[in-house]
């Protein structure tokens, strides 16, 4: 299992696991013993084995399902970077194993497709019978896209990278064939039949700003951004014209900005661990400073969560006390849902985020396709859908070429050492 699977099981981040198991700093090893706090294990055991699965992949999104007909779905294709085209016939098993171990993209492709296979099997049980083509994107892209299977497909999923995907999108010009970018969300060429299924950073920022405006417009907004995020700071100042901008990173700087009669929403924008760590520590200390028998209420938020918040230098307890709130393209599931149970039974491990992405994207694309047989004409009838860890809400972007961008973003918040969806 990877760190992601362990986090879904036990609610412990990679940095938490490394703190408990210093030998894991260079990665997880096969057959290694891992120490997990009893409280976290007991919570997983009780959830995984005694609770009712909280996700039914055969009965989700009833509105979409009721509008979707199996008769409208005929053929789809996957173009994924398996990178196996150059593997010869000699000692094939060893070569494939080495490719999965030594190459970074091949495991992602196989994980994604393993989740898609569960979705395809589920759809078949729901009465959907259609042709599925699978191609290795490391082959001749022009030859692949000219294949009759691709030309006849109503939906093409992949490739992963922006460069390869844009090449495919430029070669498939038939508006009856929707081309879906499964993982890339930067510099996608949005032709009229192209779908950027992963929300962009700008979309995530906009969704978070809208959430804050809707829920905290009357509260005390505080902006804290380092010198490398001045553009984002200016954007936040325009969005929240009454916000206070803290320039002095100190206890006094925060004390002067905090309001003890309102909730304080501190927008922290930085990718520097020293800056973020100091800000979190000072804000957490401020929670204990009483004025007129009142303690301040502080919510730490960011409109763009970088990897810096995964650092072992940050305390999850402090982030939880500050109700850390941020946008994300995928929420965490706890591994007790019926898809994860079925995946583990099939493959022997819990699904990682790529397997879940493959499942969610396949389910959504096929069910949407079933509404009319053409993805483009479905978007006016079907709004936002939500599956295990991913949302889909497509909006046509006429300014970028007429393609579609996914607006489906989760807003989540740390609460009592759990990450909960608030929007």
Regions found by a protein language model. Give the residues of each.
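Extracytosolic ligand-binding ectodomains
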Residues: 1-11, 15, 19-423
